[in-house]
Regions:
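Conserved, mostly hydrophobic/aromatic
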Residues: 33, 37, 63, 94, ...
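Flexible, glycine-rich active-site loops centered on histidine and acidic residues
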Residues: 2-22, 81-146, 150, 193-194, ...
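Short, acidic/polar
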Residues: 20-33, 86-90, 172-185, 242-243, ...
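Hydrophobic faces of well-ordered beta-strands that scaffold small-molecule active sites
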Residues: 7-13, 41-43, 72-75, 102-106, ...
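N-terminal small/glycine-rich loop or linker at the start of catalytic domains
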Residues: 1-18, 110-115, 147-167, 233-260
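Alpha-helix-loop-beta-strand connector modules within alpha/beta enzyme cores
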Residues: 50-74, 127-134, 138, 299-306
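N-terminal beta1-alpha1-beta2 module of alpha/beta enzyme domains
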Residues: 1-66, 168, 289
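Active-site mouth loops of central-metabolism enzymes
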Residues: 11-24, 77-85, 164-175, 230-231, ...
């Protein structure tokens, strides 16, 4: 059975790189991924970054304008550095422009987000929950009254609503047990980060499924995904070298080459993807790190889309 018949596949836009960003490559990947049958396109948010990176809403709006069917997601937007009111409006706008194709991935963020943006860490989990609740309320209610610890809204109106009902899906990430329980309660999908190991993903999935069951939700109907940084080449040493450069320069973690990424010949890459599917994934985000047009077609063949 082809991999495409077991799980859905997303494709990363080439929006973050140690090399200057290439709009020709972004345009090609967006259109070609849609034509090949990938389900969604994804980006990350990294404004203060030591490598080149586009704003997620801006580049997804561009992708929306040059495609018609493929879904458009960010994994993840760090809510702590944004107003949830602005996030709700931006993503309602993107959902309108794309005719209901937006997927909002959200996260708590890391230490550097709170330091660089001068955001207090105190109460960050409570604030994150309130931000998700405020976004959902603004998307679904004609007038919003919300009294939380961090956000106070009294009869406010955001007239622009998303196309998608009840609202665009909200995905979460991170494999900490508390984060998995939050995802089971608040989210519409979960994606393991590209920097986390494949082994950690395998450990997180059973805990997430148990948390979903505890919330009375069907784990088989809940998107469980993993972003995988990838390099495929008939010469496995070439593939590994490309991925090693990525993890060294972007993540500053060369060990991620083997622990978190997948590299090798087409046969080796397919075998590793099968292993991740066997861990419980029902969606995989493939993230080539170079030669994007060539890698896109190669990966489409590996998973059975061509």
């Amino acid at each position: 059975m082809a991999l495409k018949d077991k799980v859905a596949f997303g494709m990363s836009l080439p929006h973050r790189s140690p090399d200057p960003l290439d709009m020709v490559a972004i345009r090609h990947v967006a259109r070609r991924a849609e034509a090949l049958g990938f389900r969604d396109l994804w980006v990350t948010e990294n404004a203060l970054d030591h490598v080149y990176s586009f704003d997620p809403v801006g580049i997804l709006t561009y992708a929306a304008a040059i495609t018609t069917r493929i879904r458009l997601g960010a994994s993840v937007v760090v809510l702590a550095v944004h107003s949830p009111m602005n996030v709700a409006h931006q993503w309602a706008t993107l959902d309108r422009i794309s005719d209901g194709r937006a997927i909002l991935g959200v996260g708590l963020g890391n230490e550097h987000h709170y330091r660089d943006y001068a955001v207090p860490k105190e109460g960050r989990v409570r604030r994150f929950r309130e931000e998700v609740e405020v976004i959902k309320a603004l998307w679904t209610q004609p007038k919003v009254t919300y009294h939380g610890r961090f956000y106070q809204l009294d009869g406010v109106t955001m007239s622009l609503k998303p196309v998608r009902t009840p609202h665009p899906p909200i995905w979460m990430g991170v494999g900490h047990p508390d984060a998995l329980r939050r995802a089971a309660k608040l989210a519409d999908g979960w994606m393991g980060s590209g920097g986390s190991s494949i082994a950690a993903f395998g450990q997180a999935v059973p805990a997430l499924r148990a948390a979903l069951q505890a919330e009375g939700r069907d784990p088989d109907k809940f998107p469980i995904s993993k972003r995988i940084f990838m390099a495929v080449d008939e010469n496995p040493e070439v593939a590994r070298a490309q991925l090693h450069r990525w993890f060294t320069e972007v993540y500053r973690n060369p060990a991620g080459t083997d622990a978190s990424g997948i590299h090798g010949t087409p046969e080796q890459v397919r075998a590793r993807l099968e292993e991740v599917v066997a861990m419980g994934a029902n969606h995989l985000l493939l993230n080539p790190v170079s030669r994007h047009a060539e890698q896109l077609d190669a990966l489409a063949g590996i998973v059975g889309l061509t």
